[in-house]
Amino acid sequence: MAPCMLLLLLAAALAPTQTRAGPHSLRYFHTAVSRPGLGKPRFISVGYVDDTEFVRFDSDAENPRYEPRARWMEQVEPEYWERNTQIAKDNEQSSRVDLRTLLRYYNQSAGGSHTIQRMYGCDVGSDGRLLRGYEQVAYDGCDYIALNEDLKTWTAADMAALITKHKWEQAGAAERRRAYLEGACVEWLSRHLKNGNATLLRTDSPKAHVTHHSRPEDKVTLRCWALGFYPADITLTWQLNGEELTQDMELVETRPAGDGTFQKWASVVVPLGKEQYYTCHVYHQGLPKPLTLRWEPPPSAVSNTVIIAVLVVLGAAIVTGAVVAFVMMRRRNTGGKGGDYALAPGSQTSDLSLPDCKVMVHDPHSLA
């Protein structure tokens, strides 16, 4: 095969769920996986409106059916589920044939596991009109065949895919796919956006922070996190004194958080002690303006010790001052004689031992 250009079909299919005028997309992801010795291939079909999964079919389910994955899909009539369940089962059967066919095209043995991925759908603008339609097929993670932007022709990735291309051209496959993309796909997307507008047209702004990670050779990694945002489109950049560090930055793909929002991070390696010269910038449509963040070091142990010592000294000074003030007040009240009590006439101080007196701290909550 030609050099593999891994399609991000599964990554997109795993993506889950502001108010947005557009564009919007309706996409379906089909995955068929052979598993020799473990039974028939598994077939999964997942549908997305923008970044929200709304339907799913899994051939491994106890009762394989097209099932809603979003609450707003409960408004769809029962016939929708019956019709699409049958379509999914037909696609499951076709995928088994396709897996066997590609084994033959690539002269592969039947002993290994192989995967076919298919993604198709449409994008519409804020006016509801079609912006583009697409269909892509991958085999074992590599491009196989794709519908071109004109929606009339196909691009084959290798010699094996050319066989499929010729068959599809003879069968008029592009014309049928174009009719669907320009018609039913756009119509259903409009309907889904209307039914699910509370979810699909919302915006959740990202919560961002920077973490600090030690490295050898007097280096550290600064990692800028953006969490809990929707929709998935976001930009994270690092700057050094105002200049972007695109080449030196590690950036991960946007990932689903599992709660209908997304997360992402970008990191740079910087010299130890120079962290404050680096800033992270977060751009998202849910933010009134971009965020700018720096690494904020926690208070040092020395600073904490000094603060505690100062508080102890101040506390001791306050207590000492209160005691001195109390004694001075008592002296004034007794005319400076040094005490409140005089010995009774005839008392013999030498005959009595002093009691074992202990200071009792008064409990302000006690009634005694």
Curated annotation (Swiss-Prot):
The chain crosses the membrane at residues 306-329. Residues 22-111 are annotated as: Alpha-1. Residues 1-21 form the signal peptide. Residues 206-292 form the Ig-like C1-type domain. Residues 112-203 are annotated as: Alpha-2. Residues 204-295 are annotated as: Alpha-3. Residues 330-368 are cytoplasmic. Its main location: membrane. It is found in: Membrane. Residues 296-305 are annotated as: Connecting peptide. SMART domains: IGc1 (SM00407). It is a single-pass type I membrane protein. This is H-2 class I histocompatibility antigen, K-W28 alpha chain. It comes from Mus musculus.
